[in-house]
Amino acid sequence: KCNPKGFTNEGCRGIDKKHWNSQCRTSQSYVRALTMDSRKKIG
């Protein structure tokens, strides 16, 4: 089953686990950066 965000609570899923794991880490880091940036702007 596909996850629109490219990752799940259990971890990344894909045909190529190495590829998807790399994409997942990149996405999560990007989301964290946006979240921190948003908090700085709000607070």
Curated annotation (Swiss-Prot):
One of its GO terms (biological process) is negative regulation of neuron apoptotic process. Keywords: Growth factor, Secreted. One of its GO terms (molecular function) is growth factor activity. It is found in: Secreted. The keyword Kinase does not apply. Pfam families: NGF. InterPro entries: Cystine-knot_cytokine (IPR029034), Nerve_growth_factor-like (IPR020408), Nerve_growth_factor-rel (IPR002072), Nerve_growth_factor_CS (IPR019846). Coiled coil: none annotated. SMART domains: NGF (SM00140). GO terms for cellular component: axon; dendrite; extracellular space; synaptic vesicle. The keyword Cytoplasm does not apply. It comes from the Eukaryota. Disulfide bonds: none annotated. SUPFAM superfamilies: Cystine-knot cytokines (SSF57501). Belongs to the NGF-beta family. Promotes the survival of neuronal populations that are all located either in the central nervous system or directly connected to it. This is Neurotrophic factor BDNF.
